[in-house]
């Protein structure tokens, strides 16, 4: 046994795949419906997959003596739904987070996330009929196709998280340039 401890020791990393939470244990992928606990902090991490950069939210969750880090792409229905539901509850109290995924009749994928507290699913704080201060999607034309830009909504949710978890939400890089910048020599 060693006195050295890795920061991630005792932490279960959870990702989302087609509406289920997944975790790799001993090389085997295990799936779960949801995760329960209290959110202690949320970090925004820049990462890369197959040469394409993206940003993910790393949601730190504690339940009894277990620690989880739920990771989700910031530019996803999972993240937007998670934030919208969490805002209508008490973000500092215990929650149950359950991602969802389905395809519509045309085969279009729809990702979402349900959040419950005290045994009740939380409604979205912002809706189409009552958007409040949530920025509207912007219509843009790209290569002749009309699309919707959600950049302002993503920034809105990141700012809300930073304020809600003040001192606990951080922007980090997957790897620092030097990795040893805080050494005294």
State where each predicted segment sits.
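OB-fold ssDNA-binding interfaces and closely related basic DNA-contact patches used
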Residues: 1-71, 80-86, 102-155, 159-162
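Intrinsic disorder/low-complexity segments in short proteins, especially the signal peptide
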Residues: 76-77
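Short acidic, low-complexity intrinsically disordered linear motifs used
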Residues: 173-185
């Amino acid at each position: 046994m060693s006195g050295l401890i890795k920061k991630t020791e005792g932490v279960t990393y959870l990702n989302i795949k087609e509406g289920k939470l997944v975790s790799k244990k001993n090389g085997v992928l295990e799936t779960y419906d949801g995760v329960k606990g209290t959110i202690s902090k949320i970090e925004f991490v820049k990462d890369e997959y197959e040469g394409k950069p993206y940003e993910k939210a790393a949601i730190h969750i504690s339940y009894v003596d277990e620690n989880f880090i739920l990771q989700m792409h910031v530019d996803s229905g999972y993240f937007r739904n998670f934030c919208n539901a969490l805002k209508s509850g008490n973000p500092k109290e215990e929650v149950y987070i359950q991602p969802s995924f389905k395809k519509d009749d045309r085969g279009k994928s729809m990702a979402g996330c349900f959040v419950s507290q005290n045994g009740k699913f939380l409604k979205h704080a912002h809706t189409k009929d009552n958007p409040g201060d949530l920025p509207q999607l912007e219509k843009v034309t790209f290569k002749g196709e009309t699309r919707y830009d959600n950049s302002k909504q993503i920034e809105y949710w990141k700012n809300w998280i930073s304020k809600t978890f003040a001192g606990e939400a951080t922007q980090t890089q997957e790897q620092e340039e030097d990795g040893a910048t805080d050494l005294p020599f």
